[in-house]
Amino acid sequence: ADMVPLTGVNRTLLRRGLVELANSARPGVVALKQVSGISGGDVSAGQVGFRLGPRINAAGRVDYGVKVVELLTTDSAEVALRIARELDEHNHERRGLEAQVLEQALEQAAAAFDGGARHSLVLAGEGWHPGVIGIVASRIVERFYRPTVVIGFDNGAGKGSARSIRGFHLVEGFRRCAEHLEKFGGHEYAGGLSIRAEKLEPFAEAFESVARQTLGADDLSPLVEIDAILRFSQVGFSLARELEILKPFGIGNPEPLFMTPQAEVRERKVFPAGVRYRLRDDGCTLSAVVFGAGDDYPGMPGEKIDVAYRLSENEWNGSSAVELRIVDARPASAGSL
């Protein structure tokens, strides 16, 4: 499973493929959906990307990819369920390996970041599993917003995976550091490389030099691109269901991102996975949630925030409500739109 632009033929294939996945009676598909916690009718692109895909990929990351072929070609429901459960176990194992490497990589990144002075991050460790370094690189970019290379070494031989940010062409960056690499490939935002341990420091210095020459100060802060500014009175089931027509969302067809300025925080609750709010604007009050946030996230009761969000329908106890999934927020200023 991989990520591709969801435009043109790709989007058509995915729309039809999601229908096939939802209706398929193939034992392997049924079993994979079962262990992934997907039940009921429709299958979404998000469920493919975050539930089915990781279990398919986990086989090749920690075991052998042929298991996926066996799963999808068997006519036996019993065999399919056994293999699907194995893939689910591999995915849990992959997540454990990812957590271990991510913890070490975050420590290195925090030490190297130097208060934002670095324009790039090259992180490495002995024994870091090659099956998870790409995921770890993505997590580091999410946290620090720098072109990031994560390398796992085994007896002096390193395999690296990299992720980039807007304005820095990764493979072009590698090309300018090619004297330190055994081989490399990829595209603008993702790539891979092979490197010897003795070349690690020279490569990191050269890569940082290229990043400094390429990226200005404004490039080092993530840009939130808003599709439309809305008042809460414009937000409801009608809009949410019109957006359904635009699905499936993904690369090349991103889910619309909205912004409401100066929303008043009525309630706020921090919970293990993030922060929940009740926000009020234009005479309407809506629920909102941001995942992965903590006590320091903007917006205390009584304050006003500018909030960027996507829409979702939240079903609970048999009732539905439109909820805001917060992407970014900042304290509202007098100059807010």
Model-derived regions, located:
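Mid-to-C-terminal polyanion-binding domains and interfaces
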Residues: 79-85, 89-123, 168, 175-337
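Hydrophobic helix-and-loop "lid/oligomerization" segment in the mid-to-C-terminal part
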Residues: 1-199, 229, 269-271
